[in-house]
Curated annotation (Swiss-Prot):
It comes from Rattus norvegicus. Residues 144-174 are annotated as: Stress-sensor region. Autocatalytically cleaved in response to mitochondrial depolarization both at the N-terminus and C-terminus to generate the short active form (S-OMA1). Autocatalytic processing at the C-terminus takes place at residues 426-435. The S-OMA1 form is unstable. OMA1 pre-processing by AFG3L2 may participate in maturation before OMA1 autocatalytic cleavage. Degraded by YMEL1 in response to membrane depolarization. Protein turnover is regulated by prohibitin (PHB and PHB2), which promotes degradation of OMA1 in a cardiolipin-binding manner. GO terms for biological process: cellular response to stress; cristae formation; diet induced thermogenesis; energy homeostasis; glucose metabolic process; HRI-mediated signaling; integrated stress response signaling; lipid metabolic process. It is an enzyme of class 3 (hydrolase). The gene is Oma1. Belongs to the peptidase M48 family. This is Metalloendopeptidase OMA1, mitochondrial. Its main location: mitochondrion. Its EC number is 3.4.24.-. Homooligomer. It is found in: Mitochondrion inner membrane.
């Protein structure tokens, strides 16, 4: 097992690669100018390289600063806390920020090797089979249901009466069979529940992690093909900003289950869409439209924390599992609809009603629940990264205010897969006091300046007052051309107020 190099500089990746070489070949000689060269004898002595001929792996826990290796006899040895801290501080100071003395000629390493609990060839057929069978099972349900209806319609009256009598005689057996099926379904459901280590909530998982990771890799290839001409280069300041935020969030939350297990890779797409998403395999996609919509790094940190929370919590696999379960139950109801409805037109109408009921009663409410959970965990990730969490609700207030200014129609929340902007802002406002306490626990510096939420409300109030006075001024001029002009109050632009708060 090797290191996974993620959002690291080329020099730090070279050092980690050197530590891996040290583990495999027992020797690694860094350049003379590397500040880490004088510390390697202590590493060799602690790991016993003079007596042990081979080791299997070297592990670096970034925030805990422990360098460990697994020996051939399956035992592990770690540097002491003081030695690990010294090595970690040197690694961070001299390599993360671009010191070239350790590796002047090495390019950045994006990914070395992925972890697998099963061979990729064994993992491939299952998710691909699910994708293929999903439309097939719906077609099969329609064919079976329609066939049952045609069979029943073709039966003569005497055979229909005979069949009804048989059902009445065996009703208890049928009831017992249905009860057994229901019991098996309940057992299947509860045996596929898993408890999230982050939230403690039980969730249904029907898709294995490796199988779903393969699906994520396939989805990643599709997105990369679509965005191949719109990706910003790694030298672009916007890319570097997003990379810095993602790296800071993940490094400050290494103790959160799942964060350290994912190799986070950043992609910035040149697009006016206000959007960002993270695939379950750690591929982060951020659109420049979102970068233009946020006011400062605090808002961007919260939004990326929200997307990272989706990946860490496994929401994609959870939603896919729910969809598979509902598809199975829907197949039963679909068969019944096509069997009971006397005409195909009525069956099509019944199928449409069934799909809409499933969408608006299960799919969309569940999606809104997952979004709210990602908001909560994303706010906690941002708080542990010492972000001004008060800016989180301001972003959604800005989005709501912008939509109202543009006159966009306000749809009911139950029609959407996401909570409304106003409800999200209110929900975050209720969570912010707890997030501020978490910042204090993490020894973050105290927040300075006024509350950005108050600044935003005052700014909006001034904008609305000035707008009303301008409208009143125009109306008075039309009615009384000779009237004295009304003195216009000084307008406080939105960008100025928010920029002033950011500078503070």
């Amino acid at each position: 097992m090797n290191f996974l190099y993620g959002l690291q500089s080329a020099t730090r990746n070279q050092f980690l690669s050197g530590v891996n070489t040290l583990a495999r070949r027992r020797t690694w000689t860094p350049p003379a100018g590397c500040p880490l060269a004088s510390r390697l004898p202590a590493v060799n002595a602690n790991w016993g390289l003079s007596t042990v001929s081979h080791c299997y792996s070297v592990i670096l826990l970034p925030r805990n600063l422990h360098f460990c290796r697994t020996l051939k006899n399956k035992r592990s040895r770690c540097l002491s806390s003081a030695q690990s801290k010294e090595m970690g501080v040197l690694t961070y100071n001299w390599t993360v920020w671009g010191d070239a003395s350790c590796s002047p000629n090495y390019a950045a390493i994006r990914e070395v090797r992925s972890f697998h609990t099963s061979a990729p060839r064994q993992a491939a057929p299952v998710p691909l089979l699910m994708l293929i069978l999903k439309p097939v099972q719906k077609l099969l349900a329609i064919i079976v249901g329609r066939g049952i209806r045609k069979w029943w319609q073709a039966l003569p009256p005497d055979k229909k009466a005979l069949f009804k009598d048989s059902v009445k005689r065996n009703k208890w057996r049928l009831l017992l069979g249905l009860s057994a099926f229901g019991l098996l379904f309940v057992v299947f459901y509860f045996t596929h529940l898993e408890v999230s280590p982050v939230t403690g909530r039980s969730k249904l998982l029907l898709v294995g992690k490796e199988h779903f990771r393969l699906l994520s890799d396939l989805e990643y290839e599709v997105w990369m093909e679509e965005f191949k001409n719109d990706l910003l280069p790694e030298e672009d300041p916007r890319y570097l900003t997003v990379k810095k935020v993602v790296y800071h969030l993940t490094q400050c939350n290494q103790d959160v289950p799942g964060v350290s297990e994912i190799n986070w890779v950043v992609h910035v797409v040149h697009s006016p869409k206000v959007n960002a998403f993270v695939l379950p395999n750690g591929q982060v996609f951020v659109f420049t439209g979102l970068l233009n919509s946020v006011t400062d790094m605090h808002q961007l940190s919260f939004l990326l924390g929200h997307e990272i929370a989706h990946a860490v919590l496994g929401h994609a696999a959870e939603k896919a599992s729910l969809v598979h379960l509902l598809d199975f139950l829907g197949m039963i109801f679909l068969t019944m609809i096509w069997a009971i409805c006397p005409r195909d037109s009525l069956a099509v109408l019944g199928q449409w009603i069934q799909s809409k009921l499933q969408e608006y009663m299960f799919d969309r409410p569940y999606s809104r629940t997952l979004e709210a959970e990602a908001d909560k965990i994303g706010l906690q990730l941002a708080a542990k990264a010492c972000v001004d969490v008060r800016a989180s609700s301001v972003f959604w207030q800005q989005m709501e205010f912008s939509e109202s200014l543009h006159g966009y129609p306000k749809l009911p929340e139950w029609l959407s897969t996401h909570p409304s902007h106003g409800n999200r802002a209110e929900y975050l406002d209720r969570l912010i006091p707890q997030a501020l306490k978490l910042r204090e626990v993490c020894n973050c510096p105290p927040l300075s300046g006024p509350d950005p939420r108050l600044l935003f409300r005052l700014t909006v109030k001034h904008l609305l007052e000035d707008s009303e006075k301008e409208d009143l001024n125009i109306t008075v001029k039309k009615q009384k051309p000779d009237a004295l002009p009304i003195q216009k109050q000084e307008q406080i632009p939105l960008t100025y107020a928010l920029g002033k708060r950011t500078a503070g």
